[in-house]
């Protein structure tokens, strides 16, 4: 059974696992300042990080949650996923491998 590369239907695993994974990655990039602050606090605090890093943890959670709840952000990530899936269905090469196999000139 050949799959239509441009088909827009999403399977359960795509909606509930793969697209949220892209959302997490992109949200972490966009909240990089809060991620860095929280990471630094945890490294500096050691065992007491649970108590000492509450402010940084709250700021990070607020930033990430704002993206997770944004319907436009979900649509952006969904379209990115559909584009990658379409490319995979046309070429048979996963995105990560395609990016790794780019020729380098020296």
Curated annotation (Swiss-Prot):
Annotated GO MF terms: metal ion binding
Chain span(s) of sequence motif Cx9C motif 2: 53-63
Residue interval(s) of motif Cx9C motif 1: 31-41
Single GO cellular component term: mitochondrion
Disulfide bonds: 31-63, 41-53
Main location: mitochondrion
InterPro entries linked to this entry: Cyt_c_biogenesis_Cmc1-like
Compartments where found: Mitochondrion
PROSITE patterns attached to this UniProt entry: CHCH
Keywords tagged on the record: Acetylation, Copper, Disulfide bond, Metal-binding, Mitochondrion
Transport found in the keyword field: no
Domain CHCH, residue spans: 28-71
Modified residues (N-acetylalanine): 2
Keyword Metal-binding applies: yes
Subunit structure: Component of the MITRAC (mitochondrial translation regulation assembly intermediate of cytochrome c oxidase complex) complex, the core components of this complex being COA3/MITRAC12 and COX14.
Protein family membership: Belongs to the CMC family.
Its job: Component of the MITRAC (mitochondrial translation regulation assembly intermediate of cytochrome c oxidase complex) complex, that regulates cytochrome c oxidase assembly.
Protein name (Swiss-Prot/TrEMBL): COX assembly mitochondrial protein homolog
Species whose genome carries this gene: Bos taurus
Lineage: Eukaryota, Metazoa, Chordata, Craniata, Vertebrata
């Amino acid at each position: 059974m050949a799959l239509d590369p441009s088909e827009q239907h999403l399977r359960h695993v795509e909606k509930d696992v793969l697209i949220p994974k892209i959302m997490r990655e992109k949200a972490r990039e966009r909240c990089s300042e809060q991620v860095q602050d929280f990471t630094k606090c945890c490294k500096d605090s050691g065992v007491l990080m649970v108590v000492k890093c509450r402010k940084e943890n709250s700021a990070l959670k607020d930033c990430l949650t704002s993206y997770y709840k944004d319907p436009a952000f979900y649509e952006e990530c969904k379209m990115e996923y559909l584009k990658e899936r379409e490319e995979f269905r046309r070429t048979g090469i996963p995105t990560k491998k395609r990016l790794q196999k780019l020729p380098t000139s020296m």
